């Protein structure tokens, strides 16, 4: 059975009140259990998912609230795309640990702004990965906006033919 692991981007979104700090380096937060400090970076998140042995590994991303203003959403998308480049570099320089293929999926962010979603989708599909995920939806935006963003992303993705199926 295939295993998919999440990078923790959505979990970071839910860490309000834990001293969460989002920077270019990654995300620092305190454990809600014992107060210990932790740092997630694109690189160590890739390493963790490699160690888990997931078949599908999600890129590390920031999941901004659905109600984010345009400037914050644009800044967040820029950060997510820079983190994605670091995820791809780390993933591609490491090998699976358990003798089977693992796949890194970019996550398409952009809140409910069509131009940001379009930019994110174009970037994601340009990386020639086996798939991608649509992130940052169902986080406070109205349902009709969520469906509109899915449509924006799907229009981009179906115009590319980068899906490669493994052969046996």
Question: Where would I find each of the regions flagged by the language model?
Answer:
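Alpha/beta enzyme core
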Residues: 86-103, 111-137
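Short, well-ordered coil/turn segments that N-cap beta-strands
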Residues: 1, 54-55, 100-104, 128-130, ...
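Active-site beta-loop-alpha junctions enriched in small/polar residues
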Residues: 8-10, 62, 107-113, 137-139
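Alpha-helical scaffolding segments of alpha/beta enzyme cores, especially the outer helices
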Residues: 44-47, 75-82, 86-89, 115, ...
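Active-site-adjacent beta->alpha loops and helix N-cap segments on the catalytic face
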Residues: 68-73, 140-150
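Hydrophobic faces of well-ordered beta-strands that scaffold small-molecule active sites
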Residues: 3-6, 57-59, 104-108, 132-134, ...
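Non-catalytic, usually N-terminal nucleic-acid engagement modules in DNA/RNA processing proteins
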Residues: 1-97
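Conserved small/polar residues in nucleotide/adenosyl-binding loops
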Residues: 161-167
């Amino acid at each position: 059975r295939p295993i998919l692991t999440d990078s923790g981007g959505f979990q970071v979104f839910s860490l309000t009140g834990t001293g969460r700090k989002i920077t270019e380096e990654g995300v620092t937060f305190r454990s809600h259990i014992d107060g210990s400090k932790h740092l997630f970076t694109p690189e160590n998140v890739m390493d963790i998912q490699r160690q888990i042995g997931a078949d599908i590994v999600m890129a590390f991303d920031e999941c901004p609230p659905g109600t984010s203003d345009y400037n914050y959403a644009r800044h967040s998308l820029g950060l997510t795309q820079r983190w994605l480049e670091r995820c791809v570099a780390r993933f591609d320089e490491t090998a699976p640990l358990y003798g089977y293929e693992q796949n890194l999926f970019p996550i398409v962010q952009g809140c409910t702004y069509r131009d940001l979603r379009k930019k994110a989708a174009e970037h994601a599909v340009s990386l020639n990965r086996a798939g991608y995920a649509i992130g940052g939806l169902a986080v406070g935006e109205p349902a009709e906006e969520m469906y509109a963003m899915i449509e924006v992303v799907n229009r981009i993705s179906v115009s590319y033919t980068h899906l490669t199926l493994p052969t046996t």
